């Protein structure tokens, strides 16, 4: 009853008004899975390729009809008649058929949408929720946990039209006992942050990921206003709520000059100077996690950063590792960072995503499941976080339905698991157990 009978692709719209790929996989017995590919703004140069049409007369060149054609043509032809329960085989067929290193023939957006839709269809045919099916695929059947959210409540960098260089300032409700309580705490801090910003005359418009995007005097001021909001919500900073940042430093790295140019503050740094700048913020605020603290190619700088901060806080590689096991293996061998951000469209299939999570965990690295800045209502990452017991999730702020869809799915899953998925809070963060 899990044989594929039809594969269908369509062009839908993401949260930035750009087209993306949605796929349906239909099985014998009437079981159907549907999934959509997300899209990033600050992308690593070694990510799998997102195939766009380039026809300026449609969607300013961002159409995905070529990827849809691949789904409805070559991919559908290859998968009809195959067993959807064998996820590894389904993904391998698509990867082999594409035949390129970075999935540039069909597009990672096409392959991923089908990969995830297939997993959903297989779960339906087994009569189980997606997170349970993912746990079985992962070889960890029945082992679940609820992830600690990293909530991006101030957006800067490529995610906002403001003068803040650092891309994300996040809170983690570590004092919560459950995921549902963590969401409530995050919402309370978010609403209090709106009041704090308004009281200072700042704009409260939101960025791509639902966080506020004001023009601020400095990156440190972003942390200061969040600290005020945490206190105003009745929580203790460092005890109930901790802080995290995504620098997305590749976006302000001047490759020719070899310097980090923070235009918002009018400052430039060498790698070593920027590492010490970050270390100063860690001393000043209860920051427990920093993502992409340097440019993706600055491995010598990352080695220094890991020496400087790696035993104190979590250092997450996003553009650095791009959910790629080859690159992650090199990072592990060289002692670079201590955590990986998991974005399945960076690599382009569920099987490869699970392999990256496993490699990280086996090496003592943490794995943080993440959305992209261009999202849809698809909430698969919530099931991925629970089904792999990854421990942490990054899925935006407390506004925009493309973000809260994931939190709402986590609330439903926690309720369904009724105590079988512990919420471990700060223990999940590298260096904080």
From Swiss-Prot:
Residues reported to bind (2R)-2-phosphoglycerate: 167, 343, 372-373, 394
- What are the catalytic residues? 209 (proton donor), 343 (proton acceptor)
The cofactor remark states: Binds a second Mg(2+) ion via substrate during catalysis.
According to its UniProt record, in which pathway does this protein act?
Carbohydrate degradation; glycolysis; pyruvate from D-glyceraldehyde 3-phosphate: step 4/5
Which of UniProt's keywords are assigned here?
A: Cytoplasm, Glycolysis, Lyase, Magnesium, Metal-binding, Secreted
Gene Ontology biological process terms in this record:
glycolytic process
Which reaction is catalysed here?
Answer: (2R)-2-phosphoglycerate = phosphoenolpyruvate + H2O
Q: Which GO terms describe its molecular function?
A: magnesium ion binding; phosphopyruvate hydratase activity
Write out the annotated subcellular location: Cytoplasm; Secreted; Cell surface
Q: What is its EC number?
A: 4.2.1.11
Q: What are the names of the required cofactors?
A: Mg(2+)
Report the NCBIfam families cross-referenced here: eno (TIGR01060)
User: HAMAP family, per this entry?
Assistant: Enolase
Task performed by this protein: Catalyzes the reversible conversion of 2-phosphoglycerate (2-PG) into phosphoenolpyruvate (PEP). It is essential for the degradation of carbohydrates via glycolysis.
How it assembles, according to the record, is:
Component of the RNA degradosome, a multiprotein complex involved in RNA processing and mRNA degradation.
**Listed name of the protein:** Enolase
Q: Which organism is it from?
A: Vibrio vulnificus (strain CMCP6)
Q: What taxonomic lineage is listed for the species of origin?
A: Bacteria, Pseudomonadati, Pseudomonadota, Gammaproteobacteria, Vibrionales
Tell me what gene encodes this. eno
């Amino acid at each position: 009853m899990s044989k594929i009978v039809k594969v269908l692709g369509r062009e839908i719209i993401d949260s930035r008004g750009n087209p993306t790929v949605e796929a349906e996989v239909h099985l014998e017995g009437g079981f159907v899975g549907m999934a959509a590919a997300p899209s990033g703004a600050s992308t690593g140069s070694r990510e799998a390729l997102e195939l766009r049409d380039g026809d300026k007369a449609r969607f300013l060149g961002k159409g995905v009809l070529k990827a849809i054609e691949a789904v409805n043509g070559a991919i559908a032809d290859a998968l009809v008649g195959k067993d959807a329960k064998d996820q590894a085989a389904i993904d391998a067929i698509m990867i082999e058929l594409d035949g390129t290193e970075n999935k540039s023939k069909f597009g990672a957006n096409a392959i991923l949408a089908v990969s995830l839709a297939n997993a959903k269809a297989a779960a339906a045919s087994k009569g189980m929720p997606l997170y349970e099916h993912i746990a079985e695929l992962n070889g960890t059947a029945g082992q679940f946990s609820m992830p600690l959210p990293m909530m991006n409540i101030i957006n800067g960098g490529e995610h906002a039209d403001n003068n803040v260089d650092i891309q994300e300032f996040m809170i983690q409700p570590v004092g919560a006992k459950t995921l549902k309580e963590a969401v409530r705490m995050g919402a309370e801090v978010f609403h209090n942050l709106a009041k704090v910003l308004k009281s200072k005359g700042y704009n409260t418009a939101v960025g791509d990921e639902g966080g506020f995007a004001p023009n601020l005097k400095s990156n440190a001021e972003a942390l200061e206003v969040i600290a005020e909001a945490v206190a105003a919500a009745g929580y203790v900073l460092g005890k109930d709520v901790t802080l995290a940042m995504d620098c997305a430093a590749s976006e302000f790295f001047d490759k020719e000059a070899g310097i980090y140019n923070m235009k918002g503050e009018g400052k430039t740094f060498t790698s070593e100077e920027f590492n010490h700048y970050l270390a100063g913020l860690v001393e000043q605020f209860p920051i427990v996690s920093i993502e992409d603290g340097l440019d993706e190619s600055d491995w010598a700088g990352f080695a220094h950063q890991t020496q400087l901060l790696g035993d104190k806080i979590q250092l997450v590689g996003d553009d650095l590792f791009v959910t790629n096991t080859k690159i992650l293996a090199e990072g592990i061998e060289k002692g670079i960072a201590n955590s990986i951000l998991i974005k399945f469209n960076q690599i382009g299939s569920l099987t490869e995503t699970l392999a990256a999570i496993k490699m990280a965990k086996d090496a003592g690295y943490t794995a943080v499941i993440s959305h992209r800045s261009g999202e849809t209502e698809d909430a698969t990452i919530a099931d991925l976080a629970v089904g792999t017991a990854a421990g942490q999730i990054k899925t935006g702020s407390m506004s925009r339905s493309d973000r809260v869809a994931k939190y709402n799915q986590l609330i439903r899953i926690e309720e369904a698991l009724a105590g079988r998925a512990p919420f471990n809070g700060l223990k999940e963060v590298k260096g904080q157990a």
